[in-house]
Regions:
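N-terminal glycine-rich phosphate-binding loop and ensuing alpha1 helix
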Residues: 2-67, 71-76, 81, 116
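Short beta-strand-to-loop acidic/aromatic patch adjacent to the donor-nucleotide binding site
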Residues: 116-126
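Conserved core of the sugar-phosphate nucleotidyltransferase
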Residues: 129-212
Length: 212
């Protein structure tokens, strides 16, 4: 059994990216894709299994570009995100749906290939080494309890802003005990003069640039 599994969400259509498959676009000096960096950092942190959540029509390209290569370094499994892979009590209620479900259903699709504490990441985001170290340390030191243990690795807002325009971020709110209370999807956050600002018709809104 795996000590800690890395689950990579890679089934998204990527319609805003254009005609190519965003998750498989090379960005490194030797043709590396973003997942190469995430997997390298995860293995270095201690993760010993990788699960790719993909669409069935991406399988061939996925294996040719990254899957077959990664299998030489670590145990690899695939989960296919299908529209009808939902709890039985909901089957038949969404027969006309064509849009893929979100992250929750994608994780559910992994139920037959994940048997250990796991970390979920996006295929097209860069996280950095420290994020994987923090997650692995948490996942491999869980208390003995029947209560489900969940964590989230957050990033300080100022470290996620761009010099090239506004970005969308999930801004977190925590309670007095440091526990996550809310996540608000916030659009068009810009970095100006060391501040995080959203320009609106009725005035500028400033965010705490040191918030998670």
């Amino acid at each position: 059994m795996s000590k800690a599994t890395l689950v990579i969400m890679a089934a998204g259509i990527g319609s805003r990216f254009g005609g190519g498959i965003k998750q498989l676009a090379p960005i490194g000096p030797n043709g590396e894709i973003i997942m190469d960096y995430s997997i390298y950092d995860a293995l270095e942190a201690g993760f010993d299994k990788v699960v790719f959540v993909i669409r069935k029509d991406l399988e061939k390209d996925f294996k040719e570009i990254i899957g077959n290569r990664i299998e030489k370094e670590v145990e690899v499994a695939y989960a296919f995100q299908e529209l009808d892979d939902i709890p039985e009590k909901f089957s038949g209620k969404f027969t006309g749906r064509t849009k893929p479900w979100g992250t929750g259903q994608a994780i559910l699709c992994c139920k037959d290939v994940v048997d250990a504490p796991f970390l979920v990441i996006n295929a097209d985001d860069y996280y950095g080494k420290e994020a994987f170290k923090e997650a692995y340390a948490y996942l491999t030191n869980l208390p003995s309890t029947d209560i489900m243990q969940i964590c989230m690795v957050s990033f300080v807002l100022k470290n996620t802003l761009s010099d090239n325009g506004g970005v969308t971020r999930g801004v977190c709110k925590v309670d007095g005990h440091g526990m996550l209370a809310d996540i608000e999807e916030t659009h068009n956050i810009e970095k100006e003069d060391g501040k995080a600002v959203i320009h609106k018709e009725d005035g500028d809104v400033f965010l705490d640039i040191d918030s998670p």
